[in-house]
Amino acid sequence: MNEELLRLKNLCVDYKVKEGYLSAVKSVSLTINKGEVFAIVGESGCGKSTIAHSILRLLPDRNEVVKGNIFFNGEDINEYTDKQLEKIRGKEIGMIFQNPLDSLNPVYTTGFQVAEGIMLGNVTREEAWNRVVKLYNDVKMSDAEKRTKSFPHELSGGMRQRVMIAMMISRTPKLIIADEPTTALDVTIEAQILNIIRKLRDDFNTSVMLITHNFGLVAEVADKVAVMYAGEIVEQGTVFDIFDDPKHPYTKLLMKALPRKTKHEGRLKTIDGTVPRLTTDIQGCRFENRCPYKIDICEEIDPSNIIVSESHSFRCHLSEGGESDE
């Protein structure tokens, strides 16, 4: 039986801008179970990272408004004070940021920075240092003991990402949020990072929220997938649901736009049009201006969430069967 770890219920995030409020995330609901890799995919600017940062209250200071519920281990941490949230940030929920060089202090060795978190658990400096070496070995860092004395700028992008992963697992969090963890890494290093993520899930029953636009990455490691467009989740299901039986027009078009290995596919397919301005009060479906299947109702009414199966749902007026949960 699946045991729930994280549940978002009607999460909304608005940023205050000159024109008013920008609806960056609208009514997002999802559940991540223990030991599960849950991928959130979509094009740049769709709200993926905003969801991740809102969980740990790391949003930029833009007079943001966060509404909805963020349940972690059964408690709504969106109601926590900053002091309460500090107790689980890093310890219970860890985050791997997109650019590890920006996340590491350039004036301290990487080993010192990893050990710093370990010593919060009342262990000696020697014990912490030995643990750092072991962690570096666990994440397949070559010449681990030597690398603990390296500064961030002395390491490659792949090695810096390993340092960040070692830092996150040093306190064995229940949930790791990985925000584009393989961006700018070559395919060999990417494969190694994927193996580390799998090992985390298998060895420690760690749950992973994987933020990415890379469908290849999703196919390799994800158990469940949510597809985002313009701040909304338009479809979610198991990785097999999304890849083998996509329902939402946007998901279908994304799948058709994926590069193929054969030379008989012709020109690379694209999705016409642009994302709507999220500062306006959008009536109807947010994808209607780009959808080749749209009907009149799409411009006027926000689509309901259609339940295809226990694991699979999508938001569209072209329901293709299934029942509405609204």
Where are these regions (language model features)?
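Conserved ABC ATPase signature
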Residues: S150-L155, M159
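A short, proline-enriched helix->beta-strand linker immediately N-terminal to the Walker B motif
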Residues: S170-K174
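Conserved ABC ATPase "signature" region
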Residues: D76, E126-K146, M255
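P-loop NTP-binding/switch modules centered on Walker-like glycine-rich loops
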Residues: E43, I177, P181, L185, ...
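Conserved ABC transporter NBD signature motif
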Residues: E64-D76
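Short catalytic/signature loops enriched in Gly
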Residues: E4, E145, Q236-E326
